[in-house]
Amino acid sequence: MAVSNSLTISPRKLRSDLYSYSYQNNSKTPLVISVLSSLIDRTLTRNERISRRALPSSGAGGKTQIFDCREIPDMTIQSYLGRIFRYTKAGPSVYVVAYVYIDRFCQTNPGFRISLTNVHRLLITTIMIASKYVEDLNYRNSYFAKVGGLETEDLNKLELEFLFLMGFKLHVNVSVFESYCCHLEREVSFGGGYQIEKALRCAEEIKSRQMIIQDPKHHHHHHQLARILL
C-alpha cells in the first residue's frame, strides 16, 4: 500500500525530480536513477543477444577495453546507481548528463557495446565527469573511486581515456538536455514505469529476505563494493 504509492513512477514525477529536486525536502533516491537503470538493463539484454549471434570482430577499438573489468561486480545497475547517489549526492541532472555522455561515447566508438564487464566502470566514470561539468562543488577522484569500488589510479586512467575517446566534447546545451529528459519520460510513458516499479518491488522483497537469512558474520565475504564503508 504505502510502498506501492512511494514506488509509483510517472513522467510528471520524473520531470519534477529532474528540475526541482531538493535534498533538504526529499531524502529519497531520485526517480531518474530507476528510469536510467531500466534503460541500461534493457541495453545490456539486447547487447547480450547481439553478441551471441555476432561473429568475433576485430573492429572494436582496443582503447575502449580499458573499461572491461576482470570480475563482474555483484551489484545490479539499480543498486550501483543508488550507491553512487547515496554517497555523492550527485543531483538528478548529473545522471541525465552522464546518460548523454554514454550515448555520445557509443556513437563515437561504434565498436563498443555496453556489457556486464564494462557498464559499472562506464557509469562511475561518466557520472564523475558529469558531476564536474554540472555541479559547483565536487568530491575528489579518490572519493568517487572509493564509492565505485576502484583504485584511484584506475579511475584517473578511465577518466582520461574517456575524455580523449570523446574528443573532450562534454558540452550539453539546454535543448540536448531537454531532449534526453523527454526520452527518459517516454521510457516511463510507454510501459517502462510499470517495469521499473515491478523491479523495485522485487528488489525490496529480495533485500528483506536477505536481511532475514543472512548471518552478519559472513558480511565480509561480499564483493568488494559491499565491503567499502564510508
Curated annotation (Swiss-Prot):
An individual GO BP term: cell division
UniProt xrefs under Pfam families: Cyclin
Keyword Cell cycle: yes
Tissue expression notes: Expressed in roots and stems. Expressed in the shoot apex, leaf primordia and young leaves.
SUPFAM superfamilies for the chain: Cyclin-like
Keywords assigned: Cell cycle, Cell division, Cyclin
Listed GO MF terms: protein kinase binding
InterPro entries assigned to the protein according to its UniProt record, in alphabetical order: Cyclin-like_sf, Cyclin_P/U, Cyclin_PHO80-like
Subunit structure: Interacts with CDKA-1.
Homology family: Belongs to the cyclin family. Cyclin U/P subfamily.
PANTHER family in the cross-refs: CYCLIN-U2-2, PTHR15615
Name of the protein this chain belongs to: Cyclin-U2-2
Organism: Arabidopsis thaliana (Mouse-ear cress)
